[in-house]
A protein has these predicted regions:
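Extended, non-catalytic structural segments that build the interaction scaffolds
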Residues: 298-305, 312, 342-349, 386-398
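Amphipathic alpha-helical core segments of compact helical bundles
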Residues: 22, 243, 338, 359-367, ...
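Basic, nucleic-acid-interacting segments
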Residues: 1-308, 319, 325, 346-350
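Core structural elements
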Residues: 200-213, 281-282, 318-342, 351-369, ...
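Strongly charged, low-complexity linkers/loops
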Residues: 373-387, 391, 397-471
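Structural motif
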Residues: 322-323, 345-354, 395-398, 455-459
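C-terminal non-catalytic interaction appendages of large macromolecular assemblies
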Residues: 155-160, 198-205, 214-217, 428-491
Length: 491
């Protein structure tokens, strides 16, 4: 049934994304952005006078962070400013902001006026979404609310390089909002700008929504929704708000410009505070930082070194390698998995066979280690090792079933699959005489099933094949087994 939202009002959505940049040090000081591998991230251990906002300290711009925002701007078809990029102070008070202001960009951002084509599977079409800006700023500290009348502040996150990406109000449905977020995350991961992990807060997303009567060109009262920890939450929050706005408009009620939070358990939004405007933050130029002027030569170097973007990679997989749209989508949704697949193919394996194994059994094993944060490129079994195993299967030297057993062994050990096959005696049996004897033994052992098959019960055939494979520990050549079984059953 059509709702008031779909029949009388047009949904207008703009999206803001904050993504932590993949740098080793913070935005304006030399403190590390993460704890050393294998060590606990103790609170307030990755701090210095600069990121704690001590008087007399001066910020120094992180060149790598600037490069990653330029790379993002290129990927989003933005204009990259070369004349004067200005840092500004965004003034507000909150316990997680040690200086009492945040160094950001406002009037003169690094990247602006971009555009992104977004496939929307739920609508069966692509939409073009304008990118207003992509700029640099510093992250805030992390508050830990203990529920005992006070909160704790961990300043390890304070000063971590942050990129804010803001869209034009071009999004017209909750499904488009979700698709935009997923597409942007894939791009950021492919170009190495951010890990895009919403679970850890390294990528945070907010939706701004309003409704207007169909055919109108103005804008309605805008509401911002926060506390969105997944793209699914974004979609559901926008659906809820669209219906809430439509119902209020139908009743003639005035909507309030405000910030609301998404209640995942309740499936609704909750009012948090009135929505701030830009002038509430009293932006003014950061006096401790000169204007930033990226050279055209440097921007050209970054452009020339750009990795393949997800859309181009997906097209290559489908048009050049002949993969299905589904397999291409699964691979490009995980840049590490796609990189692993490319190396398997480079090792001489056919693309379709490689895709079957990488998106199938290999991904299943990878998902078992999801809690450890293991990525495809970090697995002990190198792509060349998986290519060796697939080659053994394609060459008929090991069965698919036994190959899965081998993969489970070498996935974590990194051993040569060929060595494991030989050591465990898992190689495929091609001895026609042996297979003939094993088939005869199975038919003698199961006379009732043989009679049922010969009486027309075709599904018994699979049972008989399974018994032959069981007697040979899964090593018999399936093609020879089928041929011999047919010969003896029909002879």
């Amino acid at each position: 049934m059509a709702t008031a939202t779909s029949t009388r009002y047009e949904t207008i959505i703009g999206i803001e994304v904050h993504a932590q940049l993949r740098t080793e040090s913070k935005m304006f000081c030399g403190c590390p952005t993460s704890a050393p591998p294998g060590e606990p991230d103790e609170p307030n251990t990755r701090v210095c006078p600069v990121c704690l906002g001590m008087p007399g300290t001066l910020p120094v711009i992180n060149r790598r962070a600037v490069e990653l925002v330029i790379r993002t701007g290129i990927a989003l078809d933005c204009h990259v400013e070369t004349e004067a990029v200005r840092f500004e102070r965004k003034n507000y008070f909150y316990p997680d902001l040690p200086k009492g202001y945040q160094i950001s960009q406002y009037a003169l951002p690094l990247c602006s006026n971009g555009r992104l084509s977004v496939p929307v599977p739920a609508e069966g079409a692509d939409v073009s979404i304008g990118i207003t800006r992509a700029h640099l700023e510093e992250d805030t500290a992390r508050l830990q609310h203990g529920g005992r009348g006070y909160s704790l502040v961990d300043f390890n996150r304070a000063g971590v390089p942050l990129m804010e990406i803001v869209t034009e109000p071009d999004v017209r449905s909750p499904a488009q909002a979700r698709a935009y977020g997923e597409t942007l995350r894939d791009i950021l991961r492919h170009i190495g700008a951010s890990d895009g992990d919403m679970d850890t807060g390294s990528m945070r997303i907010e939706g701004n929504i309003s409704l207007r009567p169909m055919g109108s060109s103005g804008f309605g009262t805008k509401v911002e929704v926060k506390n969105l920890n997944s793209f699914r939450s974004l979609e559901h929050a926008m659906e809820f708000e669209a219906e809430r706005h439509a119902e209020a408009l139908e009743r003639g009620e005035a909507l309030v410009q405000e910030t609301r939070g998404w209640d995942e358990n309740g499936g609704r939004t909750i009012s948090q505070r009135s929505k701030e405007e830009a002038n509430d933050y009293r932006y003014f130029p950061e006096p401790d930082l000169p204007p930033l002027r990226p050279s055209r030569d440097w921007i050209a170097e970054i452009r020339d070194a750009m990795p393949e973007l997800p859309a181009a990679r997906r097209e290559r997989y489908e048009q050049v390698l002949g993969l299905s749209a589904y397999d291409a989508g699964v691979l490009t949704a995980d840049v590490a998995l796609a990189d692993y697949f490319d190396r398997v193919v480079a090792a001489g394996i056919g693309p379709k066979s490689a895709a079957n194994w990488v998106t199938g059994e290999f991904s299943r094993l990878l998902n078992q280690h999801a809690a450890d944060g293991l990525r495809a490129t970090e697995v002990a079994l190198r792509p060349e090792g998986l290519a060796e195993l697939i080659g053994e299967v394609d060459g008929g030297r090991v069965s698919g079933t036994n190959a899965k057993t081998v993969l489970a062994t070498v996935f974590a050990s990194g051993e040569s699959p060929r060595a494991v096959i030989e050591r465990e005696g898992l190689g495929q049996v091609h001895d026609a005489g042996l297979i003939e004897r094993e088939v005869a033994a199975v038919l003698a052992e199961f006379p009732e099933q043989v009679a049922e098959y010969r009486g027309g019960k075709q599904q018994i055939y699979g049972f008989l094949v399974g018994q032959v494979m069981k007697r040979t520990a899964g090593r018999a050549d399936a093609k020879l087994v089928n041929g011999e079984l047919r010969r003896q059953l029909d002879g």
